Amino acid sequence: MCSSDLGDYDGLSVVPRPGHADYTAGVKYGGHADFAGGGAFSGRLTAPLCIAGGICLQLLKKQGIEVISRIASIGSVEDVTPLTVSTADKPFPVVDDAVGETMRAEIAAAKAEGDSVGGIVECAVLGLPVGLGGPLFDGMEGRISSIVFGIPAVKGIEFGIGFWAARLRGSENNDPFVVENGTVRTTTNHCGGILGGITNGMPLTFRAAFKPTPSIRSEEHTSELQSHA
């Protein structure tokens, strides 16, 4: 995943690109920041994360744990079909293929205008035992979030119904417990499979928001930092 011309990145320490880490990295690391291809802040670093994830998926499968995911939205286009099966074999990983075509059109429209769009990825972990995690800083939400935010362009995360829970009453948000065939489960999963930072045996679900790709063809404003122009 090489850059075709590293010269494209010359001068970014004094003329930072909007939406990129050029300015913040330049201030923090001074003359030691690597701007070629975005350096440590490049979206290319998604590639090794995918490799590591692929290995982890195989190890988890041996434990009876499955991780499934899908594109939940692109721009304003949302796939509201529940995530229940893997979309890994699809070239465009959505549950509803018709909605996927609309998402593709949304991407193409932004590209034609020299712009970009963001999106949301939804994940579910199936087969987790009860009792993983802990309170406070050992909670599953915190541990997962620290990893997810290591993915380039991630700007937000929510577990279960996330921020929507703030609009509900406790009686609406609470997940009732039932016992089926000797197994404790809940009739709903608003909590996303986590209570008190600890897994409860239900699918662990979360959604991660990705900002629009900052590298766009549209003209943008910035400043020449040395002359403050």
PLM features: residue spans?
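Short intrinsically disordered coil segments
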Residues: 12-15, 138-140, 223
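Short, small-residue-biased leader/transition segments that mark boundaries at the very start
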Residues: 1-3, 224-226
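Glycine-rich anion/phosphate-binding loop at the beta-strand->alpha-helix junction
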Residues: 114-219
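Glycine-rich, N-terminal phosphate-binding loop and its surrounding beta-alpha-beta segment
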Residues: 4-24
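Glycine-rich, mobile lid/loop segments that gate access to catalytic sites or pores
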Residues: 27-136
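Pore- and pathway-forming membrane helices of multi-pass small-molecule/ion transporters and channels
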Residues: 17-27, 218, 223
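Short, well-ordered strand-loop elements centered on a beta-strand within folded domains, enriched
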Residues: 8-11, 69-71, 184-187
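Predominant activation on well-ordered alpha-helical scaffold segments within soluble catalytic domains
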Residues: 21-24, 48-57, 104, 142-149, ...
